[in-house]
A protein has these predicted regions:
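Active-site neighborhood of phospho(di)ester-bond hydrolases with catalytic His/Asp-centered motifs
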Residues: 1, 53-56, 114-118
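Catalytic core of the metallo-beta-lactamase
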Residues: 7-72
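Conserved hydrophobic helix-helix packing surfaces used for dimerization/oligomerization
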Residues: 29, 52, 145-147, 231
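Short hydrophobic segments within beta-strands
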Residues: 55, 117, 148-150, 179, ...
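FMN-binding flavodoxin-like domain, especially the glycine-rich phosphate-binding loop
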Residues: 65-69, 74-114, 119-121, 162-177, ...
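Terminal amphipathic helices with adjacent charged low-complexity linkers/tails
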Residues: 112, 116-148
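Glycine-rich phosphate/diphosphate-binding loop of Rossmann-like nucleotide-binding domains
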Residues: 156
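Short acidic loop-to-helix transition motifs that present clustered carboxylates
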Residues: 181-187
Length: 257
């Protein structure tokens, strides 16, 4: 219906489902439905003989590079972009990621290349990104605590820095990320939240509320349905002083313990 609506053509559609094949002569395309990875109508297909998986949105990146293949780009940069993509887009679908990857692996198809819809093509050890997806889908976290804050007159920043110092003194092995939200891209922020075992969120009170940078972040965070992460709120006293109570309520509403 969607294609007909866009192109106004009454083509002879052949609607395929998981396990169906399209004969191309000496090769076949094998189809697997992957709904919500990350669109409802997603599907991947596998090209026999060439052992290529056209993975649609899975295993991709929002990564601008003139190189086509994964072995031709900076590896650290590539995997940062892979993690950012997963964190910001696929986190709510962790259980579906595991289920679909296991379904694909159960087909026992040889795999020489993974071609996502966007980002580099995986030709060097293509299953490495599959293994990472399985790892990330297990409610992933590192030994990291992220402190997120915004500030008006620097007092909330002073609190954030004092908290970071206290954590470091208590546990020097824990990685601490201190992020001033108004100076950081939201997708990078979400990636750090994804990696963290705990977050702390701070804001002063403004008009009986919290700063808009903090409020808008929670709208995004809630939609990602993070699990098994600890959280706490802080804020410098001012105005009517509701910020900590409001942040705690939003943390609870977003699934943080």
């Amino acid at each position: 219906k969607s294609l007909k609506g866009q192109f106004h053509q009454d083509w002879n559609f052949n609607i395929v489902k998981t396990g169906e094949k399209l004969n191309l002569g000496d090769k076949e395309l094998i189809f697997v439905e992957t709904p919500m990875l990350h669109w409802p109508d997603n599907m991947i297909c596998y090209l026999t003989q060439d052992n290529m998986l056209f993975s649609n949105d899975a295993f991709g990146q929002h990564y601008a590079t003139s190189a086509i293949y994964n072995d031709l780009v900076d590896q650290n940069e590539l995997f940062v972009e892979c993690l950012k993509y997963y964190s910001n887009i696929l986190t709510p679908y962790n259980s579906k990621v595991i289920k679909k990857i296991e379904e694909i692996l159960s087909l026992n198809l040889p795999l020489d290349m993974i071609c996502p819809s966007h980002g580099v093509i995986w030709r060097d050890n293509p299953t490495q990104i599959v293994e990472l997806y399985l790892k990330w889908a297990q409610n992933y976290q590192e030994n990291q605590i992220t402190i997120l804050y915004d500030t008006m007159w620097e007092s909330t920043r002073d609190m954030a820095e004092a908290i970071a110092k206290g954590i470091k003194e208590a546990d020097s092995q824990t990685v601490i990320k201190l992020i001033h939200l108004s100076k950081k891209d939201k997708n990078d922020v979400i990636t750090e939240v994804f990696k963290s075992k705990a977050i702390l969120v701070g804001s002063p009170t403004v008009n009986k509320g919290i700063l808009t940078t903090i409020a808008s972040l929670f709208e995004f965070v809630k939609s990602l349905e993070f699990k098994n992460k600890q959280a706490a709120a802080f804020g410098s006293f001012g105005w009517s002083g509701e910020s900590v109570k409001l942040i705690n309520a939003k943390l609870t509403d977003s699934g943080f313990a």
